[in-house]
Regions:
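Short, gly/Ser/Thr-rich active-site loops of penicillin-recognizing serine hydrolases
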Residues: 282-299, 354-387
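Bacterial N-terminal signal peptides
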Residues: 5-16
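Short, well-ordered beta-strand elements
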Residues: 60, 324-327, 335-354
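Short, surface-exposed loop or secondary-structure junction motifs
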Residues: 68, 120-325
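Active-site SXXK
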Residues: 33, 50, 56, 79-109, ...
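Short, conserved catalytic-motif segment at the N-terminal edge
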Residues: 25-81, 102-104, 124-126, 159-168, ...
Length: 387
């Protein structure tokens, strides 16, 4: 099936282009199309969408393959599940609140609440906060810790024995990926600061960036062109029409829209210089062999990757082309990634409505951006990648 491709002209003075150009030459749109098709054949992935950002602007948008079992084509405006790329979008919104003086990254969350966190009744929109009634360490948690995955929580309470929420380590003392931590920050913003996170995301992120087909909850107008998914064994899974705003991962989007978000993150559009620096600054070292399981033992210092660290809503790293950041998104039938390099303000964003596409991510990102040193084995563990 012939892939769709959009290309945007990038106009800038020749002197500026020479000054900012990274060493790797970006491949042409037809070359990217061909590489996508090759890797889809290698992985058996049924659908794949990709965007390229250059100089902080959207340069290419591609979509190839199918959006559903009926064989309807995946298009640049097809609704796809963003999964945990939502976390990066949420962090972008939170930093705008910081810029507006509505939130302090280092003020404990207890200062924003009108009662102790465990005194709030259980609510299916959030986590079971009453489970923390015998552990006062929750009072140490700050928004910065939550955005950099240092809350002390597991990924989600429902994964715990008996489904009980608990702190596994003193907040702020190590990295452990936690969707529940992002949900806690959402709770603080809604119950403590008095904001509607869904509305703030719409106003501060989607409307600001022209992301017209992106939402934190399902919209009826998405139904005409949405992507179902394929699991690792090749079975299909229908698109989930999510009805609740979840900072950890409820966002639906398109490759065209998510490209605009990546461009804003890498260029700093919408953020003060100070907040943009915080987004991609190494907040805390990552000390485990892989992202999952989230509470695995830390590696001995000599075996840790020294440049790998938590940013705010993203993971940061250093490689042959300098400083970069990335965020992944995963579900049983979804594989997504966003990789950005500070030098040249370049990104590749990939949305796959087939989880098998993840095996192609290192090759595809390398083809577009060159060698980046993205920590693929930390992100995906022992997954076998195609060359």
């Amino acid at each position: 099936m012939r892939p769709f491709v959009l290309m945007f002209s990038l106009l800038m003075p020749a002197s500026a282009a020479l000054a900012a150009a990274p060493p790797h030459a970006l491949p042409s749109p037809p070359a990217v199309d061909a590489q996508m098709q090759r890797l889809m054949r290698e992985t058996q992935a049924q659908g794949l969408a990709l965007a390229v950002i250059d100089d902080g602007k959207v340069a290419q948008v591609h979509a190839a393959g199918k959006r559903n079992a009926a064989g309807e084509p995946l298009q640049p405006d097809t609704i796809m599940y963003a999964a945990s790329l939502t976390k990066a979008a949420f962090a972008y919104m939170v930093l705008q609140l910081v810029d507006d003086g509505m939130l302090d990254l280092d003020l404990p969350i207890a200062a924003y609440l009108d009662r102790p966190l465990p005194d709030y009744p259980a609510d299916k929109r959030y986590a079971p906060w009453p489970d923390l009634k015998d552990d006062p360490r929750w009072q140490q948690i700050t928004p910065r810790m939550l955005l950099s995955h240092r809350s002390g929580f597991s990924n989600f309470a429902f994964l715990e024995p008996e489904g009980k929420l608990r702190l596994h380590f003193d907040p702020g003392t190590r990295y452990a990926y936690s969707g529940e931590g992002l949900i806690l920050l959402q709770f603080v913003l809604e119950q403590g600061v008095g904001l509607d996170v869904g509305r703030e995301m719409q106003r501060r992120v989607f409307d600001r960036l022209g992301m017209t087909r992106t939402s934190m909850t399902w919209r009826a107008d998405f139904a005409g062109n949405l992507a179902d998914g394929w699991t690792q064994d090749g079975s299909t899974e229908p698109h989930d029409e999510r009805s609740r705003v979840r900072a950890a991962g409820s966002m639906d989007t398109t490759i065209t829209d998510i490209a605009r978000l990546a461009a804003a993150l890498v260029s700093g559009k919408g953020l003060s210089p100070a907040s943009r620096r915080e987004l991609v600054r190494a907040q805390w070292p990552i000390t485990t062999a892989s992202q999952f399981p989230t509470l695995q033992d830390e590696l001995p210092p000599a075996k840790r990757r020294a440049d790998l660290a938590a940013g705010l809503g993203v993971v940061v790293f250093d490689g042959p082309q300098g400083h970069g950041f990335y965020k992944g998104g995963h579900d049983d039938a979804v594989g997504n990634t966003m990789v950005c390099l500070e030098r040249g303000q370049r990104c590749v964003v990939i949305l796959g409505n087939d989880v098998r596409a993840e095996a192609a991510f290192p090759a595809l990102v390398r083809y577009v951006l060159g060698d980046t040193a993205v920590p693929w084995t930390w992100e995906y563990g022992n997954k076998v990648f195609v060359p």
